[in-house]
Amino acid sequence: MSEKYIVTWDMLQIHARKLASRLMPSEQWKGIIAVSRGGLVPGALLARELGIRHVDTVCISSYDHDNQRELKVLKRAEGDGEGFIIIDDLVDTGGTAVAIREMYPKAHFVTIFAKPAGRPLVDDYVIDIPQNTWIEQPWDMGVVFVPPISGR
């Protein structure tokens, strides 16, 4: 990854609210399924904005085995996704998205960020990100003191 895209808490909330406004009216949804872990915080934000109390998770782990990237489903929500929003923070190459689509073919799959390779796999997203860009999410960062350049 050659570039970095830094996401602040404020930016994330603004993007989540924009996405929530596109998902109105909220009564059309039975609930939200957040993809663990990246979709947990956006899922909480959507649940708040849409007034949805039924929130579940699908937990997927990816790991390298003989240089192949494999997905392992650790926990899944029941059903085919009908009436549910599936939320993840990002669709990148589409590996996780393909697995989600297979598990929940009737769900409405959304993300905050989308890279070109995965974009066709989601129903909606807010921000386009170049494929070679690494996203730094606010839950992965802390606020630290940065000394002045002059050193004084």
UniProtKB/Swiss-Prot annotation:
**Which EC class is the enzyme in?**
transferase
Disulfide topology: none
Binding-site list for 5-phospho-alpha-D-ribose 1-diphosphate: 37-38, 69, 88-96
UniProt keyword ATP-binding present: no
Q: Which InterPro entries does the entry link to?
A: PRibTrfase_dom (IPR000836), PRTase-like (IPR029057), Xanthine_Guanine_PRibTrfase (IPR023747)
Binding, Mg(2+)? 89
Binding-site positions, GMP: 69, 92-96, 134-135
Query: GO molecular function of the protein, one example?
Result: hypoxanthine phosphoribosyltransferase activity
Listed pathway(s): Purine metabolism; GMP biosynthesis via salvage pathway; GMP from guanine: step 1/1; Purine metabolism; XMP biosynthesis via salvage pathway; XMP from xanthine: step 1/1
Alphabetically, which GO biological process terms does the record hold?
GMP salvage; IMP salvage; purine ribonucleoside salvage; XMP salvage
What Pfam families is this protein classified in? Pribosyltran
Q: What's its membrane topology?
A: Peripheral membrane protein
Which residues are involved in binding guanine?
Answer: 92, 135
**Needed co-factor(s):** Mg(2+)
Reaction(s) catalysed by this chain, per the record, are: GMP + diphosphate = guanine + 5-phospho-alpha-D-ribose 1-diphosphate; XMP + diphosphate = xanthine + 5-phospho-alpha-D-ribose 1-diphosphate; IMP + diphosphate = hypoxanthine + 5-phospho-alpha-D-ribose 1-diphosphate
Q: Which UniProt keywords apply?
A: Cell inner membrane, Cell membrane, Glycosyltransferase, Magnesium, Membrane, Metal-binding, Purine salvage, Transferase
Kindly indicate whether the keyword Coiled coil belongs to this entry. Answer: no
Q: What is its EC number?
A: 2.4.2.-, 2.4.2.22
**Positions contributing to xanthine binding:** 92, 135
Q: What does this protein do?
A: Purine salvage pathway enzyme that catalyzes the transfer of the ribosyl-5-phosphate group from 5-phospho-alpha-D-ribose 1-diphosphate (PRPP) to the N9 position of the 6-oxopurines guanine and xanthine to form the corresponding ribonucleotides GMP (guanosine 5'-monophosphate) and XMP (xanthosine 5'-monophosphate), with the release of PPi. To a lesser extent, also acts on hypoxanthine.
The text of the family note is: Belongs to the purine/pyrimidine phosphoribosyltransferase family. XGPT subfamily.
| Record's subunit section | Homotetramer.
Under what name is this protein listed? Xanthine-guanine phosphoribosyltransferase
- According to its UniProt entry, this protein's organism is Escherichia fergusonii (strain ATCC 35469 / DSM 13698 / CCUG 18766 / IAM 14443 / JCM 21226 / LMG 7866 / NBRC 102419 / NCTC 12128 / CDC 0568-73)
